[in-house]
Amino acid sequence: MHKIGLIDYGMGNIHSVTKSLESLGEEIILIKNFSESKACKAIILPGVGAFDPAMINLINTDLIIDLKNWINSGKSFLGICLGLQLLFESSDEGKVQGLGILKGKIQKIPNIVNQRIPHMGWCELLPTKTNTLLELEELNNWVYFVHSYHAIPDDFSIIAAQVNYGSEKLTAMIENDNLLACQFHPEKSGKTGEKLLRRWLSNIQ
């Protein structure tokens, strides 16, 4: 069992993430101040909603410097959905600067015939490299998405998995050293989500 810090900044699906991790035997500590993270082995930044209000909430709760220090120190970190997007420098959705931990930006999902926005529902993960959650050739991992914007990193090598969206492929997962982030919702992805969370937890130092 680990103590996992869940950043509580008013924009996260706190209940479902907590319930999912507690079902795996983990202890969850809600973090509104980083003094509460001292006993934690990993931090999760969840997120649902819009980019600007989320960043403003992080700014107003004075969590940004400590969050960056946590990630830069090499400790385990997981971003979920909007929690992935906030890691980048900016978003077409708003005007507030992102955390800038990752270089790149968040763009509106392109309009494609017969594809709806938001991109919503169950889709198969397509690994682009062997990573903490998936082997390169591992298929049949279907997970739940709901988003209207997607990440375009400057360094494509940090993309760990993609998802098909019509003729396009969108970023589904990012991995950069100790930082892992999912555009999909593992906590809403049934047995597959449980399996992926178990793999992440097993890699926590």
Swiss-Prot record:
It is found in: Cytoplasm. CDD domains: GATase1_IGP_Synthase (cd01748). This is Imidazole glycerol phosphate synthase subunit HisH. The keyword Transport does not apply. Residues 3-205 form the Glutamine amidotransferase type-1 domain. Pfam families: GATase (PF00117). The gene is hisH. Pathway: Amino-acid biosynthesis; L-histidine biosynthesis; L-histidine from 5-phospho-alpha-D-ribose 1-diphosphate: step 5/9. Heterodimer of HisH and HisF. IGPS catalyzes the conversion of PRFAR and glutamine to IGP, AICAR and glutamate. The HisH subunit catalyzes the hydrolysis of glutamine to glutamate and ammonia as part of the synthesis of IGP and AICAR. The resulting ammonia molecule is channeled to the active site of HisF. It catalyses: 5-[(5-phospho-1-deoxy-D-ribulos-1-ylimino)methylamino]-1-(5-phospho-beta-D-ribosyl)imidazole-4-carboxamide + L-glutamine = D-erythro-1-(imidazol-4-yl)glycerol 3-phosphate + 5-amino-1-(5-phospho-beta-D-ribosyl)imidazole-4-carboxamide + L-glutamate + H(+); L-glutamine + H2O = L-glutamate + NH4(+). Its EC number is 4.3.2.10, 3.5.1.2. One of its GO terms (cellular component) is cytoplasm. GO terms for molecular function: glutaminase activity; imidazoleglycerol-phosphate synthase activity; lyase activity. HAMAP family: HisH. InterPro entries: Class_I_gatase-like (IPR029062), GATASE (IPR017926), Imidazole-glycPsynth_HisH (IPR010139). The keyword Ubl conjugation does not apply. GO terms for biological process: L-histidine biosynthetic process. Keywords: Amino-acid biosynthesis, Cytoplasm, Glutamine amidotransferase, Histidine biosynthesis, Hydrolase, Lyase. The active site is at C81, H185, E187.
